[in-house]
A protein has these predicted regions:
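A structured, mid-to-C-terminal "fold-capping" secondary-structure block
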Residues: 23, 30-35, 147-260
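Mid-length scaffold segments of soluble, non-membrane domains
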Residues: 86-165
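Bacterial N-terminal signal peptides
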Residues: 8-16
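Bacterial N-terminal signal peptides that target proteins for export
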Residues: 1-7
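Alpha-helical scaffold segments that form or flank carboxylate-/histidine-based iron centers
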Residues: 45-46, 75-82, 105-115
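Cationic, glycine-rich low-complexity segments
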Residues: 38, 42-71
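Membrane interface segments of multi-pass transport proteins and intramembrane proteases
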Residues: 60-78, 130, 141
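Sec/Tat signal peptide C-region and signal peptidase I cleavage site
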Residues: 18-22
Length: 260
């Protein structure tokens, strides 16, 4: 049980660093859409305290780990990122369908099939070269937003980081919809799908954590720049998080700084 909690914590703390991916593109699109969805700051004192704890842990543990990961050869890091993105497609597909984005769902299915087979379990990305470009990842929180659910309260959780009421519900939905989660948590599925039951629930968090480490390593400079230029880092990250979520719901592009 303790080991499981540690694995979840590692994954979640890395995941919260993905806030740096939010860009400013899509703001005009948001205005044109007439969206009135705004997240309320319900527990600011608590959220700021949890933000400080999470940020301290990131600087002490997770940023150094990301720097160590960056020391690996670029082809290894690129292949690792491709493989985790490929598995992430299995969550995107059902959410594409639930959002009525059937064309995107078909594109994602094609990408997964090509990259899993020709691309050797997703290590390489031949699908892009064949015209099936990555159209973005989807999750159940985005699906709820497409369905019209408001963000609700914004708050920061210990370990899990920033979220909204809608995205917190989305986290549960993600586990229900993600085939990777079910394969690693159900021995009967493992026997039928992969021929053995050597996988465990820990594999799910290893996979998620690996993807998050890869993302953190790509965005070290982005986060450092944001921290150096923000008067109130908590407020800046809150704004970027909420804007990024809106952009993703609208399927508008956001800017992510990366480094091989």
């Amino acid at each position: 049980m303790i080991r499981k909690f540690i694995l979840i914590s590692v994954f979640a703390l890395f995941l919260q660093t993905q806030l740096v991916s939010a860009g400013t593109e899509g703001s005009e699109e948001l205005k044109k859409s007439g969206s009135k969805d705004t997240a309320e700051e319900c527990f600011e004192g608590f959220s700021r305290a949890m933000f400080k704890v999470n940020h301290t842990l990131d600087k002490a543990i997770f940023k150094p780990v990301a720097k160590g990961y960056r020391a690996l050869p670029a082809p290894i890091r690129r292949g690792t990122g491709n493989a985790t993105d490929n598995l992430r497609s299995l969550l995107t597909i059902p959410n594409n369908l639930l959002q009525g984005e059937f064309g995107r769902a078909g594109n994602t299915v094609a990408r997964f099939g090509i990259n899993t087979s020709v691309g050797i379990l997703g290590i390489f990305d031949p699908a892009t070269q064949l015209g099936f470009e990555d159209q973005g990842k989807e999750d159940f929180g985005q699906t709820l937003g497409v369905w019209g659910a408001d963000s609700g309260c914004y708050f920061v959780l210990p370990i899990l980081g920033p979220t909204t009421a809608r995205d917190a519900v989305g986290m549960v939905g993600n586990m229900l919809l993600d085939p990777v989660y079910h394969i690693t948590h159900n021995s009967e599925i493992q026997n039928g799908f992969v021929g053995n039951d050597n996988y465990s629930e820990h594999n799910y968090f290893y996979y998620q954590g690996t993807g998050a480490v890869d993302f953190r390593a790509k965005n070290i400079e982005s986060f450092d720049s944001l921290e150096e230029n923000s008067i109130d880092l908590y407020a800046s990250l809150k704004s970027l998080y909420l804007q990024n979520r809106k952009q993703k719901i609208l399927n508008s592009k956001s800017t992510v700084e990366t480094q091989d």
